Amino acid sequence: MTEYAINVDKDGNPFGGEYAGAYNEFMYSLLDEVGYDSLKITDWGVFGGLGEKTGGLWGTESLSEPERVALGFERGVNILGGYGGYGGIGAIAEGYNVLAGRIGEEEANAILTKAAYNYIVVMMNLGMFEQPYNDSAYADSIIFSQDANAFGQETQDKSVVMIKNDGVLTGEAKTEKPKVYVPYVYSTGFSANWMMGVSEGTPSWTPGLDLDVLGKYFDVVTDTVGAATGEAGADGNPKFTKDDITRATAEEIAGCDYVLVGMTGAYSASYNSHLQAAFGAPRDLTGIDEFYYPPSLQYAEYTADTARDPSISGNTVDGAKENRSYKGKTAPADANYGHLEALQYANEIAGDIPVIAAVSMERGMVWTEVEPLCDVIFVSYNAQKTDAIARMILGQAEPNGLLVFQQPASMEAIDAQVDDVPRDMECYKDAAGNTYDFAFGMNWSGVIDDARTQKYSAAPLTKVQSHDFGDKLKTAAAE
């Protein structure tokens, strides 16, 4: 899929005078040069229909919708993404006429034939059409077989990354069922993003990990959630507050072998303070100046004192480039700040009991708030792998995963990195001296050093190697 973005240089100026990503022939030729020969789809809204001021039209504002369609096919598009809301089949048919008038019917037909071929091949390769009637019992026997379950378990084990282990876990198999304290974690439910808008969400208390799954491996001690005592929500029922919990006492925790805290990685999105509410609901903006909140990869509030100013990106529809810099602005505490508070309580009450954090992540995060409070840290991607974490604690499986993102030393380190250069960030270093860099991970023997880490230790790319973008642009400009 192509993009909406305008190609810009490091100062935010249009790069090469070319069309936006949706129409940029150099972006498409990148795929051609590396041997890609399959379906190419555009992002939504790049031909019109979502308003003439949408970002997808950059560089083609003066063209009609059929002219944009023709240009898209000419540049390499196979599918017009989300086209149902645009000018309909009439605009597409007229787009073909524009294309045929420009390059001739024979070449225009070849382009559309290739687009249809790529689409049909991809759809047929899914295998959904040759036999639409399947035996569900037979399918279940394959999907839920012992072999499939074993494969899934092995894959989950391999995906978990251990980034800290202060000698707590040795891989020695446990012969008895340990006792573990698992605290509940609080989330405000707040979210904000450009597509869905601002949502205050529904506050909740949930166990950090699946207690039913953990019960197969441990004797579990946990907290008690009381009745919700907050203000009424849209459904008329009271919302949960941070006070609607009774934590396990020091006496209850004292007999535990481990404290296990399940957490979601810290992340607050950047958004415009005048962003409308989710699903079109009204939002009172009285007294709110318009500005951008900083993104944040830490749980606590973050003031972006070292952020870029002016911003690289910014709306240019009105002729002048908008400055979206959030320098000096403050990101609120993460909606999951209560996850950090659960860890803080666990660390305070644990005494000599080892504290293990199991963190589910979708990106990097700043570890200064978390790492000093833990004896062991496991990282899972996208979702908690409760079974895998439990097996590793019990010595039934060995962690073998590697970090797929650099983990920043600080928010300032994030601001200091170059936006389009990979692996150029100052990474977090923990109390043991280990640096949470790309491809870092630990097993029972210590820091992993194998063929994978040697391969991934190559110097990061600082220029495109498979396609010399700059020379192509110079040639095009000269012509």
How would you describe each model-predicted region?
Residues 84-85, 130-136, 171-174:
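Short coil/turn segments at secondary-structure boundaries
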Residues 32, 65-76, 120-125:
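Conserved short secondary-structure transition element at the edge of the structured enzyme core
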Residues 73-82, 86-89:
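Mobile "lid/hinge" segments at catalytic clefts and subdomain interfaces of large enzymes
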Residues 117, 124-139:
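Conserved, charged catalytic cores of large soluble enzymes
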Residues 78, 125-132, 165-169:
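Intrinsically disordered or highly flexible coil/loop and linker segments, enriched in small
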